[in-house]
Amino acid sequence: MPGHGLQARGIAREQKMIYAGMTLFLEQGYGRTTTAQIARKAGMSPASFFAAFENKEALLLRLTQIMFRSQFSRAEKMLPADQSPLLLYAMETGLQLHIAECSEPLRDLYVTAYSLPSTSDFINRSMTPRLRQIFSRWMKRADDSELFELELASAGVTRSYMSVPCNMYFTMERKIRRYLSCCFRIYCVPEKEYAPYVERVLQADLHQVAENIVAETVQNAAA
């Protein structure tokens, strides 16, 4: 049927744009990449981009959705099913810091995702229901609005820590330790309860996991 053919071509065009966009974002960052470059990388005319996505931010939103699913899924697979939700939160967010540290284009991509309206809204609204599952023990009276407001705070902390590169003084260990301390305090978790999980995260080889997630995401986008 003609309608199915058009739909299939639209999906194929979109997938090509996603792969081309991800490739260019990883090479040169979000800010330096244009929609025309993405379209040419996909083997299409510059105008073809807008048949697939409204703008570059819409493409980044799709990539943000893909990356977040990948990192959360990987963190869950690293831990036993009955593991503490605090450790899962620490592992997920620590992994995210490692992904942003893999390269400067990735840092730019993640910081931008936490900054633009549609992508940051997706992140905040996706995280809010997870917060109830993770922190309900310490925030029993918090309703959804309060959790959303606190997610805005922890997302701001996340963006700030991702935006600053590690160096010989501000090591990855110091970054993760301070970052997780800030986030757990936002959700009223006592230090004696979260401290052991911070140490577990620091002992994990999250940098290798982060590189694998990026490689697998690119590979899946090409499929």
Where are these regions (language model features)?
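Helix-turn-helix
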Residues: 16, 24-58, 62
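Short, hydrophobic secondary-structure boundary micro-motifs
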Residues: 107-112, 192-196
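Extended, charge- and Ser/Thr-rich helical segments
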Residues: 1-12, 22, 31, 45-47
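Hydrophobic alpha-helical connector segments
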Residues: 62, 73-106, 124-128
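Generic hydrophobic, amphipathic alpha-helix propensity
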Residues: 10-22, 38, 63-67, 71
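Secondary-structure edge/capping motif, primarily at the C-terminal ends of alpha-helices
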Residues: 75-79, 107-110, 161-168
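Amphipathic alpha-helical packing segments from all-alpha helical-bundle domains
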Residues: 114-163, 174, 178-181
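C-terminal peripheral helix-coil segments that are non-catalytic and often amphipathic
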Residues: 132-137, 163, 167-223
